[in-house]
Amino acid sequence: MQTVIQVIASGRGSLREKIISDPRLQKFGLIPTEHMRPGRSHGWAKIHSAREAHGAINLEWHGRSGTLICRVVTKLGNKPNSIIGDFIDYLLARHQSRILAIHIMRR
């Protein structure tokens, strides 16, 4: 199952870059595992849960529209609620002033 979280942000700079470089990310149970490998498209990153939550969140920043597209991917019938909860908790705690809207869609 895949869930898409669309975050509309204001302000300058990449929200994806701010998330990946935030030293407090692990306090929310999230670990950045990959970002911008050579040969891959620019502006993407991946985070996993540091807790028992299964799955990963792929982050892609669209600078012109100020939109962060987050694809939550789980395997083997695991539900995404725990990792989504940790991620939304992190966004609202650390980047609330930049966030204009958060949309969550199931695919």
State each model region's role.
Residues 1-28:
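Terminal, regulation- and interaction-focused segments at domain boundaries
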Residues 55-81:
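Intrinsically disordered, low-complexity regulatory segments enriched in Ser/Thr/Pro
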Residues 23-28, 65-68, 88-92:
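Short, low-complexity, polar/charged sequence segments that are solvent-exposed and flexible
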Residues 25-56:
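Ser/Thr-rich, low-complexity intrinsically disordered terminal regions
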Residues 7-13, 51-53, 74-76:
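Beta-strand elements of well-folded, non-transmembrane domains
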Residues 5-7, 19, 57-59, 68-70, ...:
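Hydrophobic beta-strand residues in large extracellular and virion-surface proteins
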Residues 78-107:
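A conserved amphipathic terminal alpha-helix motif
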Residues 1, 40-44, 63-69:
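Intrinsically disordered, charged low-complexity linkers and terminal tails
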